[in-house]
Each structure stands twice: as C-alpha cells, then as structure tokens.
C-alpha cells in the first residue's frame, strides 16, 4: 500500500511539473511569441536528441523551412537563420559564449575556443595570433606538404606504378593525412597514420569528443558502476591526454638539450606569452590547447576536403574548370604552395567556399547570451536569452543567397558581391571569436586540392551510387548522406567516398 501511495505521489508531482511547463511555455514565457516546435518550448533536450541520432542537419533545414528566420530550439534558446542577424550577434563582445562551450575543455582548463569571458578570450587570442598569420604558416608549410599532399602522392603513385587506374578512398586517405599533419604540427611527432593506414588516432579524436559530450550532459556516467558504459571512450581520452603530456615533455627536453626550435604549433604554444604580463602558458594550458587543436582541426579539415571532391565529381563542369585552372598556371612537376594557390586559383577557392556553404562544418553554432535585450526580426528577445545560429539555414537563406539550393561556385567570383558572400559564410564563425585556425585550414585545403587536380585525372567508379546523372526530385545530383561528429561527415565513407585515379593526361 505504501509503495502504491508513493508511486501515486510521484506521478502527481510529475503531472504538476508537466502542467507548469506547459502553462509557462504557452502563456508566461517572454519568448512565447517566437515561433517554435512544440517540444522546443517544453524541453531543452530536443537539439541533443537530434545530435545523438545524427539528425541535426536534417532538423536544422526542416525547422528553417517550417518556422522561418527566427524560432526557438529550446525553451530559452533562439535560433537565427538570417546571416545578417547572426553577424550582429557574433560580431559583438556584448554577446558572450555560454557555459555550453565548456564541453570542449580538458579537465576544466579553458582553451582559446571555450573562454566565456571576452577579455580572457581576447588575451589568449593575442597570445596565439602571431602563430596563425601568413608568415608563420609559410614557415610551417614544409610540414604540411610533407605529411599532406606529398605523402598522398607517394601512396597513390605507388599504386599507379602497378596499374593504369586505381580506386582510392579519398575520405580515408585525406583523413589519415590530416592526422599526420596535425600530429606533426601540434605534437611534434610522427603518427605514420597514412603510411600504415592506422586509424587509432581517428578513434582517439572521435571517442574523446564523445566522452567530452557525454561527460558534460550526463556526468553521472563517470561514476561507478555506470562508468563501464563509457570505458572505451574514457580509454581513448586517457591515451590522448598521455600522448600530449609525453609530447610536451619530449619537446621541453629537446629545448633544454639545445636543439633548435621547430616552426610548429607545439612550439608556438610553448613560446606564446601573455600580452600584458609576458608570462608563458602553463604545461596544462599548453596541453589543453593542443588537445583542442587536434580534436577540432584534423577531422573538420579532412571532411571539407572530402566534400569538395564529392561535389566536383557530381558537377563535371566545375571539376573541369578547376583542373584547367590548376594546369594553366602550374607545370606538372611543380608543387603548388598556399600563397601560389591563393594568388592564382580563384575558381578552386570558390569551390571550397561553395562546398562550405552547402555543407557547413556544423549544422548549428553553440549559443551566445547577452545581458541586454535585443530586437531581431521584430521579435523582442530579453536579456539572458541564449542565441545560436542555424548554420544550415543561414547558408540557404533567401534573399541572402540567390538560388541557394544550387551548387554554383561562381557566386563567389562576382566582384560586386565579393565581400557580402564571404560575410554571409559562417563555417568558421564570424567577428570577435572567429576560428583562430581558419588560415591553417585554408592552407591545407587549398594546397591538397590544388595539387590533386593538377596531377591526376579523377572520376567516379562505375558502381558509384552518386553521380551527375543520379538526381533528386529537383533534378540536382544527389549528395551522399551525412552524419554529425566532430564535423559534418559522410555517413558511409567506405561506400560513398571512392574515386578512380589515373596519371594526368598531358598534351
């Protein structure tokens, strides 16, 4: 009887709680006038559910189609779909990052991306900025070339020495190459991932991100006995932490032994000084930044490269334009550098921009919050409301983009709209907290793709499930399915990310 009474009381409490949530959401909330899916008004777990089920991108597009330029995604979180509104928020220090960014912190130590205090964030950015400018990138470029396109060419050329044509998986190969680049730059060590087809480091990154997310949203799973549920994720996390600690110790020992300083990101972190006190970062701060760079940089860059290749294989007219551009500007035996690609390959750059527009690195941004009220699209948004950007919608927004569903790289070559189109791109964020690794990512993407299309003929395999003639209801080539991880990634890369390579045809 006592148990039945207790259960009845429990259900009554839950019913009262539900009634309160409904009444507050529909009649009392200061955001009740803003359009929203019903579940978004009563629970904050809707975006998390979409993320965990891989439906984040689909939901982002559907919500924009249904609710328009502004809507609620959680009871106290507004999503913006107009890139102009997003830029208003992202360009102001008045809108600070929320604690949600702490998901990506190592042991609670902030990194350049997770500081919520604008002053602290700017101080760290001033520490690191000299090492992400073009001059320092030029010093690091030999490492990018060695472990990137040169390693890829060595792998592919070895296969082409035995066969006239070879099928390669461009997702796996470029992914491994990006890990080798990041390992060399961030940890000063060789992963040999591409050479040995070693996916251990890929596992480290994806499992570490998953562990950070799970630990943030469900902290109780770290406690016994539930900790066994995440023991595999925790092991990858611990392995990455140990590797980073060891890498820092090795570098410090090399410096104490009088060996010359390499031009890489690990050395940049060790040399970075507080702009005011001139104090260096602590070993744990260096470790936090290095882990963040590996987790945030390698997978996102390699996934963009994969998407560019995918789109160009679907649109032969743009592929032919890129091939013609690279070969008209550079001889076959020349390795194209970043500065050369920036100066001579505008069409390739436009293709990368257009790919980032069609497939943003993430479907949404994490929220900002302001201590002051703001009016956007005629809606009053009170102080304390979280504001995030629906990147998928912002990159399809009308009238910001003409014919937004069309893959059309020349939109980024129009001089009249040159600055506007780039301002509307939110893949690397915008304003005061744009991605500090943006220039490095662009360097790796441009150099890898430029040399690929200069040196090889590429085509789809005969049994590809995607191609120029395999179209959707609108008559456009279907694109391969996506999934959300560190970035927007191909859902089935083993099946869908295959291309046939052959040696460049010379006239």
UniProtKB/Swiss-Prot annotation:
For whether the record's keyword set contains Magnesium, the answer is no
Q: Which Pfam families match?
A: p450
Q: Name one GO biological process term.
A: helvolic acid biosynthetic process
- Expression induction or repression: Expression is under the control of the secondary metabolism regulator laeA.
Q: Quick one: which pathway? A: Mycotoxin biosynthesis
- EC number in record: 1.-.-.-
Q: Which InterPro entries match?
A: Cyt_P450, Cyt_P450_E_grp-I, Cyt_P450_sf, Cytochrome_P450_monoxygenase
| The keyword DNA-binding is annotated on this UniProt entry | no
| SUPFAM superfamilies from the UniProt entry | Cytochrome P450
Binding-site residues, heme: 435
> Where does the signal peptide begin and end?
1-25
Keywords recorded for this protein, A-Z:
Glycoprotein, Iron, Metal-binding, Monooxygenase, Oxidoreductase, Signal
Q: Which GO terms describe its molecular function?
A: heme binding; iron ion binding; monooxygenase activity; oxidoreductase activity, acting on paired donors, with incorporation or reduction of molecular oxygen
Named cofactor requirement(s): heme
Kind of enzyme, top EC level? oxidoreductase
Task: List glycan-bearing residues.
Answer: 111, 206, 339
Q: Which family does it belong to?
A: Belongs to the cytochrome P450 family.
Physiological role: Cytochrome P450 monooxygenase; part of the gene cluster that mediates the biosynthesis of helvolic acid, an antibacterial nortriterpenoid. Protostadienol synthase helA cyclizes (3S)-oxidosqualene to (17Z)-protosta-17(20),24-dien-3-beta-ol (protostadienol). The synthesis of protostadienol is followed by several steps of monooxygenation, dehydrogenation, and acyl transfer to yield the final helvolic acid.
Protein name, per record: Cytochrome P450 monooxygenase helB3
Organism of derivation = Aspergillus fumigatus (strain ATCC MYA-4609 / CBS 101355 / FGSC A1100 / Af293) (Neosartorya fumigata)
